[in-house]
């Protein structure tokens, strides 16, 4: 959720904008996996919040770690659909790159890519896209510094959700625009 969306939720719950900033910090700076971890919120408020919101909706189905430190995840969404997302490290630098998916399957069916062989199932929501990065951060305890849209799917065929995710990566995760890359098969 964007800060403005959290502020709207706080308004509906009769809470202050300050609470929205606290929750925003828990989500994006600390990558919590449950509302119960937001310990600077009162227990009563956390219970109220749990009635209207949830933090994580994905689970790691498979995790593979290579000898160079690259980690590949198969992330499962509540509807049972799965996508791959990868954490890459280069040259032992502090840069941590998340390769994210934008669709379940792909309609483009490029000859060099296995994803299209299974066909297109659906677009990911912007929340499902950002959840991939949050899943990586929760699992590793590390902050992702770069994003590449080179996972499953054609990002430009899911443009609205990709643009919303980009805005959150840039504004809320504090990842600079120069550290975000979108790869396309040629869709314009």
Q: Whereabouts are the PLM-identified features?
A:
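Conserved Radical SAM active-site core
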Residues: 83-188
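Flexible, acidic/Gly-rich N-terminal and inter-domain linker regions that tether
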Residues: 1-94
């Amino acid at each position: 959720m964007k800060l403005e969306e959290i502020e709207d939720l706080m308004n509906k719950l009769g809470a202050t904008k300050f609470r929205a900033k606290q929750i925003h910090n828990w989500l994006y700076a600390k990558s919590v996996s449950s509302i119960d971890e937001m310990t600077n919120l009162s227990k009563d408020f956390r219970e109220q919040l749990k009635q209207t919101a949830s933090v994580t909706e994905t689970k790691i189905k498979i995790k593979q770690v290579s000898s160079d430190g690259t980690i590949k995840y198969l992330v499962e969404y509540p509807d049972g659909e799965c996508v791959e997302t990868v954490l890459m490290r280069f040259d032992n630098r502090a840069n941590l790159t998340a390769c994210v998916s934008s669709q379940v399957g792909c309609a483009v069916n490029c000859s060099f890519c296995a994803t299209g062989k299974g066909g297109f199932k659906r677009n990911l929501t912007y929340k499902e896209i950002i959840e991939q990065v949050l899943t990586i951060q929760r699992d590793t305890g590390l902050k992702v510094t770069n994003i590449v849209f080179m996972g499953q799917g054609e990002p430009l065929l899911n443009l609205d959700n990709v643009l919303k995710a980009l805005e959150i990566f840039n504004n809320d995760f504090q990842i600079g625009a120069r550290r975000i890359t979108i790869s396309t098969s040629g869709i314009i």
